[in-house]
Amino acid sequence: MNLQEKLQQLPNDAGVYQYFDKNGHLLYIGKAKILKNRVKSYFKFTPKLQPADKLSPRIYKMISEVESCEWIVVPNEHDALILENSLIKQLKPKYNILLRDDKTYPYIFVDFDEDFPRLDITRRIQKSKSIKYFGPYSTGARDMLDSIYEIVPLVQKKSCVKGKKACLFYQIQKCLAPCENKISKEEYAKIVENALEYIYNKTKLISKLNEKMLQYSNDFRFEEAMTLRDRIKTIEKSQIKSDIDLATNEDIDIFAINANNKKAVIVRMFLRDGKLTSSSHDFLKIDNFDEEFEFDYQEAYERAIINYYDNEIPLLPKEILIAHELEITNELEEFLHTRFNKKIKLINPKKDKKREIVNIALNNCDELLRIENSKNQTSIYEELKELFNLQTLPYLIESFDNSHMMGQATVGAMIVWNESLNTFDKKAFRHYNLESKDEYSQMKEMLIRRIESFEKNPAPDLWIIDGGETLLKLAFDIVQSVGVNLDIIAIAKEKIDAKAHRAKGKAKDIIHYKTKNGEFKSFNLLTSDKRLQFVQRQRDEAHRFAITFHKKQKRAQDKQISLLQIKGIGEAKIKKLLLYFGEFEKIKKASFDELKTVLNEKDASTILDYFTNFKD
């Protein structure tokens, strides 16, 4: 069935549609109140099927590449909106606007249910009337919190109030020892209110920190003074300067988006009780468009607002101010009402103080774009994109390796490089216990398990596989089977005498990639090439992480083997068990009948008794 015939079958229902090119690559995901009307509006059908005349240049180019269309029917437009957002985050279509780094930002919070409340940081929101949240913060949250503890004598650690004796923090005058009842709850509450003032007023916090820094310097405590200096810089960098006070107690969120030079940024500002308390920003991914297209503000705001409010929000605003007029305002308000059972208005103010606030957000967009565009030198990400024909700049990279010893303690590792951190994101590292016996199957098992988690942790921009062309083809087959738009390269040692030598100096690294025409090619770059060195750094970190986890698992296995041998279970029987179950954790959970399929009843009983009574 050709595309024109397929389009004639579109239903009159709400749903989500997907466009694919001639190679089956996903181009675009959209939603519709009536699929038939929306999808057909992209095309004109006479004299032959072609893009409609009134499309924007970006969408016109996309439609000219469309070879097939699929759709999913849902009960209503709201469900279509939610499904569209979920699929875009997971599948990363070429022509959709995406957040460069789709992450959850931290909040500072205080729980007033505690007798002596502390300030702390979290990314998880609990629904509780006793907890007050401040944020979110894209930068500076930890520095701000540490600074407040530096100048306000709050309870320093959770364990402090559980003790019965004043600790070192009391001796150095950083805590007032509520553990010894040296301060009442009422007096301590005033200290907490003082601490919160510094969150509301960062200028006051910075002024106090400068006083403290000067004091440290005069006391020749230069290391502590330098620490405060660095904190001040981070807090200043994160602060949007504004003297605007709405003179009301309104809670308002502000979203502003601007774009130029194939870069786009969103700034979010949060007013609580009429005062600006925090802000965050994200760059949008539009670098994968081949030409300078007119930026689609409608889609950008839709992505930004749905992505943000699809999470748990500690304090819902009365209204959301936006910097541009939107045609989809009613749809977004309906989404917010359904999501939170609360009416939240989206307003594009034209005058007065609310317009001033929106203009501040737009000015900060311009400043962030200016800084981004001032990075004149070609970045490593741009060089990698050009060299390997990547669809997008690889700001978020996942690298994979596996490790085992003679088939024992087989593990896989995934490490993550994040451009916004300019280093490895070790909190995002993952390791896998693998059951497969050969390297090809092990990599397949690991990549499939990673793809299964895309709904929770969306796909990165680039995968780096530790292996050759065979594993690269495997990875492409896997991602294409689920329709994910994802660039992949592989790095392997050059083979000498049919062996790949890892030792330095023995062989060079070869990078394998796939061209736009679907051909698999390779580069043998000079060892001094910074593009090679960057990819090697990713591979080496994945290898280190895999080896470290393998050694840990191997030690645990060796311990189990030794103890089982003491119980009379020989090495040959242990190998049979591992061959059948794959790992000790599964042997430990096996039933008597399952163990009997491998060993005799006596040995099965011995093993069952051993693991029933075993303590780590």
Curated annotation (Swiss-Prot):
GO biological process per UniProt: nucleotide-excision repair; SOS response
Coiled coil stretches, renumbered: none
Primary location class: cytoplasm
InterPro entries the record matches: GIY-YIG_endonuc, GIY-YIG_endonuc_sf, GIY-YIG_UvrC_Cho, RuvA_2-like, UVR_dom, UVR_dom_sf, UvrABC_protein_C, UvrC
Entries under SMART domains matching the protein: GIYc (SM00465)
Keyword Cell inner membrane: no
Ranges where the GIY-YIG domain occurs: 12-97
Entry superkingdom: Bacteria
Keywords: Cytoplasm, DNA damage, DNA excision, DNA repair, Excision nuclease, SOS response
Record's GO cellular component terms: cytoplasm; excinuclease repair complex
Location of the UVR domain: 203-238
GO MF annotation terms: DNA binding; excinuclease ABC activity
Location of this chain's protein in the cell: Cytoplasm
NCBIfam families linked to this entry: uvrC (TIGR00194)
Subunit structure: Interacts with UvrB in an incision complex.
Family per record: Belongs to the UvrC family.
Its job: The UvrABC repair system catalyzes the recognition and processing of DNA lesions. UvrC both incises the 5' and 3' sides of the lesion. The N-terminal half is responsible for the 3' incision and the C-terminal half is responsible for the 5' incision.
PANTHER family, alphabetized: UVRABC SYSTEM PROTEIN C, UVRC/OXIDOREDUCTASE
Name of the molecule in the record: UvrABC system protein C
The species this protein was found in: Aliarcobacter butzleri (strain RM4018) (Arcobacter butzleri)
Annotated gene: uvrC
